[in-house]
UniProtKB/Swiss-Prot annotation:
Signal peptide: none annotated. This is Myosin-11. PANTHER family: MYOSIN HEAVY CHAIN, NON-MUSCLE, MYOSIN-11. Residues 1771-1788 have a biased composition (Polar residues). Residues 1867-1876 have a biased composition (Basic and acidic residues). The gene is Myh11.
Amino acid sequence: MAQKGQLSDDEKFLFVDKNFMNSPMAQADWVAKKLVWVPSEKQGFEAASIKEEKGDEVVVELVENGKKVTVGKDDIQKMNPPKFSKVEDMAELTCLNEASVLHNLRERYFSGLIYTYSGLFCVVVNPYKYLPIYSEKIVDMYKGKKRHEMPPHIYAIADTAYRSMLQDREDQSILCTGESGAGKTENTQKVIQYLAVVASSHKGKKDSSITGELEKQLLQANPILEAFGNAKTVKNDNSSRFGKFIRINFDVTGYIVGANIETYLLEKSRAIRQARDERTFHIFYYLLAGAKEKMKSDLLLESFNSYTFLSNGFVPIPAAQDDEMFQETLEAMSIMGFNEEEQLAILKVVSSVLQLGNIVFKKERNTDQASMPDNTAAQKVCHLVGINVTDFTRAILTPRIKVGRDVVQKAQTKEQADFAIEALAKATYERLFRWILSRVNKALDKTHRQGASFLGILDIAGFEIFEVNSFEQLCINYTNEKLQQLFNHTMFILEQEEYQREGIEWNFIDFGLDLQPSIELIERPNNPPGVLALLDEECWFPKATDKSFVEKLCSEQGNHPKFQKPKQLKDKTEFSIIHYAGKVDYNASAWLTKNMDPLNDNVTSLLNASSDKFVADLWKDVDRIVGLDQMAKMTESSLPSASKTKKGMFRTVGQLYKEQLGKLMATLRNTTANFVRCIIPNHEKRSGKLDAFLVLEQLRCNGVLEGIRICRQGFPNRIVFQEFRQRYEILAANAIPKGFMDGKQACILMIKALELDPNLYRIGQSKIFFRTGVLAHLEEERDLKITDVIMAFQAMCRGYLARKAFTKRQQQLTAMKVIQRNCAAYLKLRNWQWWRLFTKVKPLLQVTRQEEEMQAKEEEMQKITERQQKAETELKELEQKHTQLAEEKTLLQEQLQAETELYAESEEMRVRLAAKKQELEEILHEMEARLEEEEDRRQQLQAERKKMAQQMLDLEEQLEEEEAARQKLQLEKVTAEAKIKKLEDDILVMDDQNSKLSKERKLLEERVSDLTTNLAEEEEKAKNLTKLKSKHESMISELEVRLKKEEKSRQELEKLKRKLEGDASDFHEQIADLQAQIAELKMQLAKKEEELQAALARLDEEIAQKNNALKKIRELEGHISDLQEDLDSERAARNKAEKQKRDLGEELEALKTELEDTLDSTATQQELRAKREQEVTVLKKALDEETRSHEAQVQEMRQKHTQAVEELTEQLEQFKRAKANLDKSKQTLEKENADLAGELRVLGQAKQEVEHKKKKLEVQLQDLQSKCSDGERARAELSDKVHKLQNEVESVTGMLNEAEGKAIKLAKDVASLGSQLQDTQELLQEETRQKLNVSTKLRQLEDERNSLQDQLDEEMEAKQNLERHVSTLNIQLSDSKKKLQDFASTIEVMEEGKKRLQKEMEGLSQQYEEKAAAYDKLEKTKNRLQQELDDLVVDLDNQRQLVSNLEKKQKKFDQLLAEEKNISSKYADERDRAEAEAREKETKALSLARALEEALEAKEELERTNKMLKAEMEDLVSSKDDVGKNVHELEKSKRALETQMEEMKTQLEESEDDVQATEDAKLRLEVNMQALKGQFERDLQARDEQNEEKRRQLQRQLHEYETELEDERKQRALAAAAKKKLEGDLKDLELQADSAIKGREEAIKQLRKLQAQMKDFQRELDDARASRDEIFATSKENEKKAKSLEADLMQLQEDLAAAERARKQADLEKEELAEELASSLSGRNTLQDEKRRLEARIAQLEEELEEEQGNMEAMSDRVRKATLQAEQLSNELATERSTAQKNESARQQLERQNKELRSKLQEVEGAVKAKLKSTVAALEAKIAQLEEQVEQEAREKQAATKSLKQKDKKLKEVLLQVEDERKMAEQYKEQAEKGNTKVKQLKRQLEEAEEESQCINANRRKLQRELDEATESNEAMGREVNALKSKLRRGNEASFVPSRRAGGRRVIENTDGSEEEMDARDSDFNGTKASE
């Protein structure tokens, strides 16, 4: 892999440098500095280290410049460890926040890594430079790879979608979304490039770069569309000014079979004008820059600056040459199949569009009429498009229009002419673009193969915010809004809905990303209408303008949250919409014309009649022009691709685009979407620059963070149970028992066997869900398992092949030995004289016998040659006959074959007809059953209709009763109105009387308001109390007058109050009665509606049944048509059969004549002829039987067909009768429904009137009650004043009686006291009002604090407060009398108390604000803690995974150890066996050596006897002269000696043979010994290698365990850091809780003081105290929660400490184990050295054995030295035995050491296992405790959310109760409207039923006709069959006559043979004849 070694140039932009990620320095720096992210104005977020924490603020030091900054805790975001730097999938980040995501994207972007996974989708940042990551090498790298195997890339997304399409058989789509200039078009091209390579490389070509024609065209379609549809904008040099959806179709095997491109909303206005620094479409610049001189002259081209439509002249694009691009466009067009004529025609149209802009109109002097002074440009245009100049100018300047029935010429103004030219240019370019698109689609869909599935790629114009945003920008942004909503809905809503559907544990998360309000603002049709609907509506009005459209939009949508009117209006046609990507200001100028898109039909008709075929083809559908001018002329389109609209229908651009977009969204919803989020890094189009705030805004808008969060928290991978079992059962092979098992149960068993963590998966109803990465892990394990299985299979195969080769070699070895033995025997025999004599004599013995045999053979040969000649002549004759017969046979076989084929066809036809007949019969039976069911239902419906009629009568009676009750209510209402009028008159009188009081009260209220608004003025008025004493006397007189008036008014008010209370009680009773009646009416209406709905439901069921019946009738018609076709084919087959029969008859007669001619030749031919005649007769019989059976079948078919036709006609008549009954019942039901609807309307109107009157009465009652309460308040105030004045008067008179001398002084005192009293009264009133205001302010504050809890209580307490207020006022009246006596002394105390109260109130308000702020901070900290808890939960899950992985590895380690033990035991057994075999072979060798020695001794004895005999012979020869006499005796002794010599020789030979055999045996033994030694050495070596491999594996596992322990240590350190942070947060929480407790205690003290001081003044403060108590209770609960959290944290700390201790213990144990393993390894090394020494000794032994073999071979040559060599051998064998014994003792000692080492290893393993198990159990227990604590916290949180939800519910119920009465009338209205709509639906259904009945009648007539035709055809077939039978009979009789003549009796006798054989022969005979 490229990652391991040095990365290549292209791989640097794909792979991350792992050394940088795993840097220990960076890790240590991150841990030591406590690095975090803080907000930055320049970079978005900046790295900093925490230095100090001050409560809610933190002092941090910036990493970049070392500057210290104070930041709020809530503004800090966590930083990920360095190992997560440049991570490929941002879902893997431990700390997920905006800063981390931005940092990751920034780091990857600056490293050239532009692709990054973000959960389930991919994020792409535009690099603004070329990167070498799109080559063929990269394509091959990504081909067929899984997503996690390769770094992020657009190729990976494309490959995933392609593989998912092939595997799941689901359509896929790749959606590239983002702002304009983000790189959507480029990524779309790369997707197409990748698919073109991947989908065409399957076709078996060697060179994968060679793509097919279709793939080339698919790649070249994009450049053509870009040339004509892309342009340079401010943001993007190659901006798509149209949207396109590329649908690539694939067949089942994954080949591309075709493609189709759909486009959306071409920005055609760009063709006539462009903004500053922008270009029009590329093709104009390509043409002007790249055209050659000849083409320029042909197309009348000029320079860039001479064209008006090129607003900015020539605007170059950096790094792009227009002339080169022009050539590339032409090449692409030629590849797509555009010929040169078509290319030239397209360029002519492009040039004509440019020339249209150069036509200049001027205004005439005296009139507004336009004129064309210079028509040069017009001439050029007409030349290019092939029309007449004069006609063109006339059509532009004075077009003909239709006014009524007359056609007149209308002069155009300059503005109208300019507009007409611009509209023509836009329409021409749009039509050219559409033509090119249709031509491209035609080229891409050449194959006409059916695509199994498709992959769609969406490239649509990105979100645009320009300086001037027009109608095109609205449509583009509306499309992007819909796509973003699709993304949000797919990622967040559908995902969570699937979780809930499948029933897995999931809390629904609302991410708040719903864009529906913005979409509805644009597309909503009504209530209120959206932007597009209002635009369409304005287009209908002739006097409508863009300004009126915007005004109407503001009036309709002014209050919409997403609609704004700009603050600084540049133009009255501007408005703003808040999109998901930001606010966009739209300018609606010329929107009406853009939406209508009108055209001058005079010019279009000219273009339609153009002499240029291409232009005429472009304008051939002139009638289908969108616009108001063509409304009356619109007809169905002549284009095949155009949509067919009704005549006279007006379709606007907005409507068409909305429909197109709706279809696109429906297509996308039906596919599996793969999202690619393109991000623009900066607006300067500079590479290497990334604007942090711009990227952050795009990330927020696109929902990237939310997508990552749901990917992490959710279960994005899911798989169906059956597929999971099928795919991963190999991993848990023995988990599922044999037999049937439910898929879910099987998956549960498999999951248990796989030992997956329960947090990593969820089991639903039909699928199993996994977290990210789990399926990839399972796939890797599956691949490993499959590789192991395949390797085992390969090993078995190789073993089998090796054994087979070995057996073959053994066989070859034995064969070689046999050959060697034979050769050795021959070598021994060839020098033996007797053998030579035998070989010479034996041939001579047979010579005499051979001559006799030769003569006999010659005679036989002569006889045989004669016979052969005769046989040859006979054979020739027979061959001639055979050839003739073979020819005849072939002819007959061909005829028979043709007959059999015909018979088979007719049989198939018969079977088919029988099957169809059976199907028809089954359908008929079903129809009869359904008819019976329909009849039963009809009867039920009639019974229900009767019940309905009865119910209707009951309802009518009830309605009459209700009408009577309504009349009574109206009478009561009239009386109530009269009473109300009287009461109103009385109130008017009272108003007149109390007008003066009200004026004074208003003055006092104004003063109170002034006092409340300005406290400083109140203090100044308190200081100036002395100044007001002079006014006291005048005030006393005025108050006395007022007292009298007030007493009178009070009495009158009391009377009126009593009267009003009586009236009010009466009204309440009446209202209660009315409400009861209304409730009864509602119940009755509800019942009626239920009955109506039931009736409608029944009607719907009847209609559905009728539709089903109609469908079945249609199916029967189809069956009947099929039968008719089968009958026609049967007739044709019959005619064919008749013709063939005639031919057969003629051929039979010819054959018979030929047979008669050949019968006389031989007896064999006569027999053949007799057989053939028998076959002919059998054939005739078979034909007769066939015809009879066929006739019977035809008869049966006719009868059944007629029966079926009769049954169908009966069914049709029954259907007619049922339909008539249904129509009647439907009419009656409709009448009843109409009556019911009328009654419902009357009831609704009556109810509305009653409700209206009831509301009026309630309003009047409320007014009266308020007036009464006001009067009572005024009366109480006046009575207070009266009592005060009386007391004052009494005090003054007492003072006058006491001291008459001091009258003046007393008078002054009285005056001062009076003024003081007046002031104190005013102050009292002001204080009471202030108190009320303060209490109301307190309530408001408490209501704001507890708004979710107390709104219901406030409304209930309002009534109680009124009653309490009356009672408190009465109590205050009595108390004020007492308090006035000592008021002078207490007034100063009251002032002080007032000031103190004010101060305390201010302090309380401040405390409340502080508490609110503290509460907000607590909420923030709680949220932060919750996030940290979530991170801890994620860490816990990771820890659990680590523990489970460790357990798995421990188990694997145990298994490996067990396998090692087994293998070592096997090796020990094998070694024992080998040693036993060696011992056996040694004993055999010793026995052989003994035998050898014995043989040698025998040989020596023989030699000795031989020598003795030779000596005797020599003695005898020498003594011959001496003993010559006795010659006879000597001869005898010679003969005896010779015989003895021969015997001795034979014995010697035998002994030599024995010696040879022993030598051979010894050789074999040595060879076997060598082979065994070699095998033993190889086994030992293999075992050593296996042991070494296992040792390496163990070392590897130890290393892995060490790394895992290191990771665990790091994670523990992270957890410790998190714990410290949590402890700090807890300390902060404790401090906040302490401050809250202190504040609470101070508030309690202050409240107690207030209670002591304000017991007599205000009892309403009790409610405030109760609410405060509740706040304190909640604070106590918070304290408890904080304490519990602190306890939990302490527990966590203890657990962490225990875990750390356990980890240290485990580390120690691990080190001990490592030492023991090292010692065992050293022991093992010594054993290996010992083994090597033994091997060296064995090698020496082998060399010695080889030497012994050489010595043994020398023994065979030198027999004399055999004994010496045997002694040497015996000595060496003795030494070998001693060495073997030494080796055996050494081996035993090694075995003992090995056993001791094994026992030690087992003990160590047991200890390690026990310790590991104890630590794992402790960790699991701690994890369980932590989980319980987390669950407890979750339960508390759920309880809090439940209480909040309950309060919300209460609030909603109160609001619903408030609005219920208001909504009732609206509901009744809606019910009435629903009734009307239901009646309309019923009418529509009636009309549809009538149409269906007409269709049924027509179908019935058609069926009748077809049945008649079928019966006629059946009769004709019957006649034809009869004729055929008669013909067959006649033919058989005619052909049978000559056979009788020729055959005689023999033929007749042979006819008694088996009929079956004759039948078969007959069929063969007919077949051959027919074919001939």
